[in-house]
Amino acid sequence: MKKIIYQQDEKDCGVACIAMILKHYGTEITIQRLRELSGTDLDGTSAFGIKKTFEKLGFDAPAFKAGDETWQEKDIPLPLIAHIISEQKYQHYVVVYKVKGDEIWIADPAKGKIRKTISEFSKEWTGVLLFPKPKAEYKPSIERVDSLSTFFPILIKQKSLFITIFGIISSYYFQGLLDNIIPNQARSTLNILSIGLIFVYLFRVLFEYSRSYLLLLIGQRMSMSIMLGYFKHVLSLPLSFFATRKSGEIISRFLDANKIIDALASATLSLILDIGMVILVGTTLAIQSTQLFLLTLAFLPFYILVVYVFIRSYDKANTEEMSAGAEVNSSIIESLKGIETIKSYNGENHVYDRVDSEFVTLMKKSFKSVTLDNVQQSLKMVIELISSVLILWLGSSYVIDGKISLGQLITYNALLVFFTEPLQNIINLQVKMQKARVANKRLNEIMSISPEQRNTNINISKNIFNKDIKLDKVSFSYNMKLPVLRDVSLEIYSKSKVALVGVSGSGKSTLAKLLVKFYDPSEGNITYGDINCQDIENHKLRNHVTYVPQESFFFNGTIIDNLTFGLSHQPEFEKIFRACKAACLVDFINQQPLRFDSVLEEGGNNLSGGQKQRLAIARAILNDSEIIIFDEATSGLDTLLEKEILEYLIKLQDKTIIFIAHHLSIAKACDEIIVLDQGILVGRGTHEELSEKEGVYRRLLNA
């Protein structure tokens, strides 16, 4: 196992192991692509998901439950993947790439390469092994998207900055004149030398100021391109992405972008200013004294060696630090979202202890990273100080021997700072570039995910949403788990009012989310009229099909802003008022100090559950879609309010409305009831028809 691939997040150990095995056989695929193939979610990757991924990529991957005697076999196929229980009692995967005697060599995506005895390994090993081997028709392939070069087009946009930079460089021509004049005049006049040195130091201040200013300017321009580009891409991703990622993981990558911006901005200046200064001043130094300049260059290999030695350590430390930071972010965000539950169960200490433990881990990883940086900087300083002493030592000897003048030595040392500082800037890019490389891998995990379908070549008429909806043998499962829907075939008639009923977990909400294309069916087809929903771009479909969840989200803004959210233009006030009246909201709004201009808190925290649901219903009515899906959207209402709102919705003759409800009073009012049980369609008909038959609906009715 030549190179280990570290997991970017705690749930990525399985896909990191897959990536290592693939790389061993010449294939490189992004971690995010492997997450999609293996069905990795918030619970991690299953052994079944790993096996199926290898099979999709041209491998056989038999899985076995084995014992310690396996490690004594001479022909055990390596590398293989082993399932273990980590020290933190988490399920974990590692790659075993070498077995010799009573020792096992492991590539752990969380820790790196480790060597253990068989007895030590057996204490954590569950006995599960996967043996991936390429089939005869297997062909290696390489899919790379994590190069920093993907951001270079952003730099090209900064043409005005480059012109400014070249203008600054050209204005430094005066320094070149001084560098040439001083050596010729130093012997004859101390005054000229002193004045020249003052100009040199003034130029040094100007150079540093210009460098810092340009760094800030380029950084801000790039921040807008990279960070806003990332956020825009995240918004375009399918709902399935958010179901398999913690909020902290997504946000931490947004913050990681700063490392990329810092590195690229610094690299831009180094390529233009620092390298230019090194060449310009280096030429001047060589003219001053070839021997001293050669001595200066002799220390470059030592700098390069120090940089090279720390490359792998920096990669590991940065990956661990960023991953630990994502865990802390996730826990804090999760805790703030669930503060009511935490308070209800006196769980403050439990939550604090968990965050405290994760934060201590982050501090340890951060300390390790900073310590590496300190050690490297100390080594660089040793080289710099020794080189300075040797240059003065040798230079003074040359002055004594009459090979150079004292003025030449003073001038050389005065100019040397303009050679060493830009050189240090270039060398110090290593730390920033390595952090950026790790951050870029994490960022590109998200950027490489395909956004939701936007454009299709099929011209879609809005009239198709006034036609029947058909499901033909539709099945669906989340991330290679047990099917939630199984072979469902049904027809929902245009402008009908339909209720989906069944016990919890029967697949009602999942079916609704398929209709609005939050997810795609694993098998089968859904059609609106005669058009397959896969041929309808998501944005257009959701203009005509509105989904109202049980817990709708409200933004920090006025009531009217939240009611009209997502609309291309604000409707007339009369239309807004009618929608609020239909949702029984008028009295509530009249009680607010600024009525429609009253401000809602983030998440609607100053509203009750019932008030939120009525606002969500009013928003759906105002959206005026041909099809509306209410997913338990009246569960927080009292019986009288629910009845009044339901009567209005049932009377909407021009709309197809689908209700998902546990309250059978809603089902009774509908034209048709569809009954699901464990993902299977087990009945359909009116309330009267189903209540007379023995089955799930009758059991729900009698419960």
From Swiss-Prot:
EC number assigned by the record: 3.4.22.-, 7.-.-.-
MF terms (GO), sorted A to Z: ABC-type bacteriocin transporter activity; ATP binding; ATP hydrolysis activity; ATPase-coupled lipid transmembrane transporter activity; cysteine-type peptidase activity
Domain of life where this protein originates: Bacteria
Membrane spanning stretches: 162-182, 189-209, 224-244, 267-287, 291-311, 381-401, 409-429
GO biological process: antibiotic biosynthetic process; protein transport; proteolysis
Gene3D superfamilies: ABC transporter type 1, transmembrane domain, Cysteine proteinases, P-loop containing nucleotide triphosphate hydrolases
Domain ABC transmembrane type-1: 153-435
Main location: membrane
Keyword annotations: Antibiotic biosynthesis, ATP-binding, Bacteriocin transport, Cell membrane, Hydrolase, Membrane, Nucleotide-binding, Protease, Protein transport, Thiol protease, Translocase, Transmembrane, Transmembrane helix, Transport
CDD domains membership: ABC_6TM_PCAT1_LagD_like, Peptidase_C39B
Entry's free-text remark on domains: The first 150 amino acids are capable of cleaving the signal sequence of LagA, the lactococcin G alpha precursor.
Alphabetized NCBIfam families for the sequence: bacteriocin_ABC
PANTHER family, alphabetized: ATP-BINDING CASSETTE SUB-FAMILY B, ATP-BINDING CASSETTE SUB-FAMILY B MEMBER 6
Family of this protein: Belongs to the ABC transporter superfamily. LagD family.
The name this protein goes by in its record: Lactococcin-G-processing and transport ATP-binding protein LagD
Organism of origin: Lactococcus lactis subsp. lactis
